[in-house]
A protein has these predicted regions:
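Catalytic micro-motifs at enzyme active sites that drive phosphoryl/nucleotidyl and oxygen chemistry
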Residues: 58-65, 95-112
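DNA replication initiation on ssDNA origins
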Residues: 1-72, 77-90, 128, 135
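Histidine-centered divalent-metal-coordination microenvironment in nucleic-acid enzymes
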Residues: 72-75, 102-130
């Protein structure tokens, strides 16, 4: 379950500008303000608010060994060499298969991004926070 006090690592512009830690709320406000102006990236996982203290003290996210959370599951589907119509059909089939597994439409967000589509799923599989979550996916 999503905790709005959780933090994420955010990169603004150049991918080497790491170690910026923000709450999910701050990150989402920044996306609304900057997304069309500058490149932005965020960590796949979110972290408890103590993660910011760790990064401030160590000046890096490296070797963080606390719990990690999964607020969303992102699936990146690249187009490759197939034609547009076939690719759209493939993506629709992928989404239909998710529906067949019992995932509800309100739990999925789909958008196009130049080379393909992104699917953003809520944590519909109930993955729990843990230190080992990244090894389970």
């Amino acid at each position: 379950m999503e905790n709005r006090e959780n933090t994420v690592e955010v990169v603004y512009g150049d991918i080497t500008r790491r170690n910026n830690i923000e709450t999910l709320d701050s990150y989402e406000k920044a996306v609304k303000k900057n997304a069309w102006k500058n490149e932005m990236y965020r960590s796949y996982y979110s972290f408890p608010k103590e993660f910011k203290d760790y990064v401030d003290e160590n000046e890096s996210v490296k070797q963080y060994n606390g719990s990690i959370y999964l607020d969303y599951i992102y699936i990146d589907i690249d187009k490759g060499d197939i034609d547009d119509i076939s690719f759209q059909g493939y993506v629709m089939d992928c989404v239909s298969q998710l529906f067949d597994k019992g995932i509800m439409a309100e739990d999925i967000n789909v958008w196009f991004s130049g080379n393909g589509y992104h699917l953003k799923l809520k944590n519909v599989f109930g993955l729990q926070p843990s230190k080992e979550l990244n090894t389970k996916l």
